[in-house]
Amino acid sequence: MLQEIDIKSLKGKSKVVRLKIKPDSERLPIKKPNWIRIKHVASQKVEQLKKTLRSQKLFTVCEEAQCPNLSECFNHGAATFMIMGQICTRRCPFCDVAHGKPKALDVDEPKHLANTIKKMQLKYVVITSVDRDDLRDGGAQHFKTCIDNIRLSTPKVKIEILTPDFRGRIDKVLEVFKSCSPNVFNHNLETVPSLYQKVRPGANYNYSLRLLKAFKQQHPFVITKSGLMLGVGESEKQVINVLKDLRKHNVDMLTLGQYLQPSKHHLAVEAYIHPNQFDKYKKIALKLGFSQVASGPMVRSSYHADLQIKGELIS
């Protein structure tokens, strides 16, 4: 219980207090339109999955970031595992993951993760992490160790990794993954470049693009993927320019979803994007050459990732 209280104290107001561009906690939120549908499904299966994760000292980004699709995914036995702890070294104001000084890496985590995936009989897994700017390789080696353990335990499972930007350590990342690769390498740009200081402080738009391209050059047969959250102040032209940049950097798959504010202390929603606009972006993206596009208000980067890779309709 103490751990839970500590984690909560590192979220919300305390997380964003030192940001140069602070969210306005007194601002009245925009009313949610009827197309924003959050499914709350309470079931024994959801509780059992949570119990399994806690027993192995594992966490999911679904829980830590308050994903609106948590109940639906958990009820179907799907989860995006979050490695390297619950505490992030960044203060992104859109995200509800805690900020602070992280603990040392759990050397048993890769083994626990592999055992859990085998126990759950998963065929497709997504692994993400907090930012670990305190580590020399940003946590790349830990990602690799997790992949190696999963491959040994469940050889046929497909693995997607949703990575941080590793703080500009491209050479270290490429060296670590030289002899080991996931099925999908996912790194989200999150927003348009002009909004980075407000939305994604500490990150660099061009570096993220270079990371995606460099990984694709090293592993041409690995699918590369990226995503944006919309409704934080971007224009249609800016979004289309980002899509063009992603294609220029050989990114294969795309996800587009609506940003939802986790609390009044987080970044405010500037607009709720109509489903028709998401459909328009999808058509444009496919014309630009993306192999698969998931675009809709409730789409998230790892939401039904196994279906996304098959090109099945996600909205």
Swiss-Prot record:
SUPFAM superfamilies listed in its UniProt record: Radical SAM enzymes (SSF102114)
Cofactor(s) it depends on: [4Fe-4S] cluster
The keyword S-adenosyl-L-methionine appears for this protein: yes
GO CC terms: cytoplasm
Pfam families referenced in this protein's UniProt entry, alphabetically: Radical_SAM
Coiled coil: none
Keyword hit for tRNA processing: no
Domain Radical SAM core: 74-291
EC number: 2.8.1.8
Family: Belongs to the radical SAM superfamily. Lipoyl synthase family.
UniProt-recorded name of the protein: Lipoyl synthase
Gene: lipA
